[in-house]
Amino acid sequence: MKGILLNGYGESLDLLEYKTDLPVPKPIKSQVLIKIHSTSINPLDNVMRKGYASSIVDLKLKLPIILGRECSGEIVEIGDSVWDYEIGDQVWSASPPFSMGSHCEYITVDESEISLKPKNLTHQQSASIPFASLTAWNAIYNVLPTNKKITTNTKILVNGGNGSVGFFILQLLKKHLNVNQVSTTCNIKHFEKLKKLTLVNETIDYNNLKINDNDNNKFDLIFNCYDGGKNQNENEKKCIDALKDGGNLIGFNGPLVKFSDKDGVLSGLPMGMMNQLNSSERIKKQYSKNVHLDYAIFSPSGSTLKQISKLYENNILIPNIDKQFNLNQIKDAYTCFENSNSNGKIIINNKF
């Protein structure tokens, strides 16, 4: 099969190699083999190719590896223990970060990680959704404390609403949960698009997130989709300043991987876990403010994808695509991704 091998970690796109003679994987037990029509590039793919999470990836996989976390395609073979799907089913999937990915023509995934794709979406549209939607779903429904669940009157800010996760969160909040007051920060050029889609009540330039000292103007909950990168600490402070005392902050770039990459898995993971468990206490000491900080992560789930599929089929949610490339244009696709400033997902298509 055709596929893209990552031969080493680093900035250079020359570390990505287009191959035409890779073996087609064989599904075992509860796995299915998907003929991939379309896949995508996620922010995680872009940082993983540069070495992010390599300390953990190396425990399960050895270079070269295949990146890509989501796909849409057709089941062409099933394992002996698969009962809920059959050959010919049109499905979508998002697989764990530490497994071989979808930047190729065929992939094996467990049947628990797939569902039938939305009937009203193309494979290209469907491939833009699973990874970000499952991350966002986890943040909204599984991370918040039970006494802080979102209501229609919760005042919410999505910091980074033009990114793939942020865009999905905005849609869920306004179109599914009917939250009355939703604000977002993003690049100025995305203001009109988000307003036209009626996904926000207020748009804020992400370079100018300033809330006055009146607690009534502050937010009950902030989803911090900008919590990575070199300005992470400054960004965290802006979010905390914008929260009411007793508010909730949900990030997406927890300390587990950072500590593991820095200090190795054996010492880094325990340190990262302690740091994450003590995040709220750290904020209280550092900023003299009572804010509850949690981190949301991607978690593969076919049952959740099934729920999300219904939201698309009922026209409650819409896909968001920027540009499309063929698999052999992978270097151009990554270049576009790094320069796109989140106009939508970058899609990679296979031609059979």
Swiss-Prot record:
The lineage of its organism: Eukaryota, Amoebozoa, Evosea, Eumycetozoa, Dictyostelia. Transmembrane segments: none annotated. PANTHER family: PROTEIN AST1-RELATED. Residues 11-348 form the Enoyl reductase (ER) domain. Its EC number is 1.6.5.2. This is NAD(P)H oxidoreductase RTN4IP1, mitochondrial. It is found in: Mitochondrion matrix. Keywords: Mitochondrion, NADP, Nucleotide-binding, Oxidoreductase, Transit peptide, Ubiquinone biosynthesis. Belongs to the zinc-containing alcohol dehydrogenase family. Quinone oxidoreductase subfamily.
